[in-house]
Amino acid sequence: MKSLTLRRPDDWHLHLRDGAMLEGVIGDTSRHFARAIIMPNLVPPVVTTADASAYRERILKAIPEGDRFEPLMTLYLTEDTVADDVEEGKKSGLITAVKLYPAGATTNSHGGVRDFNKAMPVLERMAKIGLPLCVHGEVTTPDVDIFDREKAFIDTVLEPLRQRLPELKVTMEHITTRDGVDYIKSSNANLAGSITTHHLIINRNAILVGGIKPHYYCLPVAKREEHRLALRAAATSGDARFFLGTDSAPHVDPLKECACGCAGIYTSINTMSCLAHVFEDENALDKLEAFASLNGPAWYGLAPNDETITLVKREEAVAFPEKIETGAGPVTVFDPMFPLHWDVN
């Protein structure tokens, strides 16, 4: 039986939500992952270190008994964020990064940044103290096509920001385009990118061909096949600038299966099985540990995990539930549209 042992992975972009949903989904992450960067776009958002501390305590209380899991907290950047509070959060060890959502870019992002000049004092302080900025890299202006938002963000927002603050460490989260891959590769320093599980597997046909498939709808939206292939090449290359951030984002089914459905795909439960399939397809199983377990910690200045997990390839396909039941309601699990034979032993 084929097997692969690697250091326990981390998830560098995760939505856990709160309340009953948090309690219903956290076990799917804590079973396999040692750490995760937790997104702050709650309602209301996590905007201060006090908010982050309280949210962290709720997460810790929800972790299933026996699981060892560390939530890495972030702050939601607004035009009113206080630089001293951000610095204190970093000094205390509570805050791992600050998250930039352009206003209106994704779920619960309406309080995000509209005028970057108002956020510059905080960004300048972050550059000074070495605190990374995680960016949702899309513009939201109505004249830009949704499939072009990432390229437009690089050209009109990110590159000018990095020219102005070259010492600011920036993570381009959930990149979805060849443009994003090439931009990161062209950088000499202070730029890296996370890649989701689902963007390695689906292109925009998955959402639109044969009827609208709401459970493949996410933001940033999946792009053309050429972009998916560029992401796969980057993820499986071993390049230290690319690492796993699942962007696993649970929504109850009624909020997905409606006239104006929410963006988000739930992948925490089967991510490692999906990744092993993808990396085996690319003859790159030897690069999976770098992508899932090594590159992310190195970028964020943390040691890799000492614990290991073992993936085993089984003859029979591994059965994952079509849905998970949470106290908030049912959540549909990502279906990669191929049988999964790799299993976490």
UniProtKB/Swiss-Prot annotation:
Zn(2+) 2 binds at K99, H136, H174. The active site is at D247. InterPro entries: Amidohydro-rel, DHOdimr, Dihydroorotase_CS, Metal_Hydrolase. Pathway: Pyrimidine metabolism; UMP biosynthesis via de novo pathway; (S)-dihydroorotate from bicarbonate: step 3/3. Its cofactor is Zn(2+). It catalyses: (S)-dihydroorotate + H2O = N-carbamoyl-L-aspartate + H(+). Disulfide bonds: none annotated. GO terms for biological process: 'de novo' pyrimidine nucleobase biosynthetic process; 'de novo' UMP biosynthetic process. Binds 2 Zn(2+) ions per subunit. Zn(2+) 1 binds at H13, H15, K99, D247. Homodimer. Catalyzes the reversible cyclization of carbamoyl aspartate to dihydroorotate. PANTHER family: DIHYDROOROTASE. Belongs to the metallo-dependent hydrolases superfamily. DHOase family. Class II DHOase subfamily. This is Dihydroorotase. It comes from Agrobacterium fabrum (strain C58 / ATCC 33970) (Agrobacterium tumefaciens (strain C58)). The gene is pyrC.
